[in-house]
Amino acid sequence: MKRPYDALMPLPKAELHLHIEGTLEPELAFALAARNGVSLPYADEDALREAYRFADLQSFLNLYYELMAVLRTERDFEDLADAYLARAAAQGVRHAEIFFDPQAHLARGVEMGTVVEGLWRALGASRENHGVSTRLILCFLRDESAESAMRTLDAAGPYLDRITGVGLDSAEVGHPPVKFREVYEAAAALGLRRVAHAGEEGPPAYVVEALDVLGVERIDHGLRSVEDPALVERLVRERVPLTLCPLSNVRLRTVDTLADHPLPAMLDAGLMCTVNSDDPAYFGGYAGDNFDAVRQALGLTGERLRELARNSFLASFLEDDEELRARYLAEVEAYRFPAA
């Protein structure tokens, strides 16, 4: 008989909060470094894996940007995305909406086309190769200037047929959403969907700004929304999805332990929560691992897990393929958890 953990892997789910650069496992990092003649300041894969034991968001971001140096060519980005999609498919992911950080690559002299075309080689073949449908979301770095974000959006112009939406990530505190008002207005005029990280380390007021100023359709993280009852009421009323990342929350010390995570209370309040992996190579788990972690730590029932899976497809940007979304939702409802 399958263990409960095994049962969560085939549970159909969508991943809506995933940074492709955050899927760079040590093995691939060293392989790409060797391919491109890049010297890494780590003796071997084990030493690099040990470096993944960071203490806070900033130390994580420092390592995250440092390792991007191995990503140079279209093939590198294709291999990165394909490796993620294979792992995601093995953990029941049927649809993935993938973030990428072009500013970090442009600053290294890697052109927008290299990044997008490389990623698209993997994403475009993902349905056939892995059974996973995909969308691509361009993220702006909030600790860079709004002018840099606008230049990045302009550089993406030739590739907008590959890009579904825009997002906002990186260090949150001190960089309120309002800083990017004009960029998001420009993205909206281009017909791009809009999401933003808010309420992870930043206050609930950032969530309100993301909704009212940036016009976002989903809140990435949004964990601190629970501190503002009026905001919770609004999120429930407007059915605004929250893309939570439980293992990330623990590693970045947003919560002390998984047992302290407010996910059950958020679901009880009627919030439309989803479970995602964020930067799984760094945070110790992919989508199915996050589902299992909250099951074990929070005692979530099969029906609660089904609700999370259902929410993930309902919150996805699959409006252009409602037939596919309906098929995925039917798979969620048809799934049967093995008896304990």
UniProtKB/Swiss-Prot annotation:
Q: What cofactor is needed?
A: Zn(2+)
GO biological process terms, semicolon-separated? adenine catabolic process; hypoxanthine salvage; nucleotide metabolic process
Q: Which reaction does it catalyse?
A: adenine + H2O + H(+) = hypoxanthine + NH4(+)
Enzyme category, top tier = hydrolase
Read off the InterPro entries from this record.
Answer: A_deaminase_dom, ADE, Ado/ade_deaminase, Metal_Hydrolase
Marked site, Important for catalytic activity, at H221
Gene Ontology MF, one: zinc ion binding
Alphabetically ordered keywords of this record: Hydrolase, Metal-binding, Nucleotide metabolism, Zinc
Family membership, please give it: Belongs to the metallo-dependent hydrolases superfamily. Adenosine and AMP deaminases family. Adenine deaminase type 2 subfamily.
Protein name per UniProt: Adenine deaminase
